[in-house]
Amino acid sequence: NDGMRSWKRINFPGDARDILTVGAVDANGENASFSSIGPTADGRIKPDVMAQGSPTAVIDGRGNISHDMGTSFSTPLVAGLVACLWQALPEKNAFQIIQLVKDSGSNASNPDNIYGYGIPDFWKAYHEGNAK
């Protein structure tokens, strides 16, 4: 979450190869101010995809609902959906699942270093994966 710092770039571990890096958008689908941007030091597009991370409803240890923000909220949202996708398509490997997620993104036709491949459409990813 370096987006509000002078160095706004994705860094470790989000800049690693062969992983799915998730940025955060707000309720309007706009890049959240705290969400890091790309490219990586070697010029790769990052983040890979985006999900809502601001505001996010959370439940604390006492069961109280509050709102917070961060890629720490957008990433588990995508991770859970990726797990469901992989469960539905068990014949796919990790690289194929990541590619399906990227290809289903709202920005897949023109990925950039702010939104990456955009907000993934997991229904689309499932159908694409099921057809291949």
Regions found by a protein language model. Give the residues of each.
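Catalytic-core segments of hydrolase enzymes
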Residues: 1-59, 102-106
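Extracytoplasmic/secreted envelope proteins and their assembly/folding machinery
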Residues: 7-10, 19, 31, 75-82, ...
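Short, isolated positions within intrinsically disordered regulatory regions of eukaryotic proteins
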Residues: 11, 90-92, 127
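Short flexible/disordered coil segments
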Residues: 24-32, 61-63, 117-120, 132
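Substrate-binding/active-site groove segments that recognize
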Residues: 47, 120-121
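Hydrolase catalytic cores
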Residues: 53-115, 119
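Secreted peptidase-domain scaffold signal
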Residues: 124-132
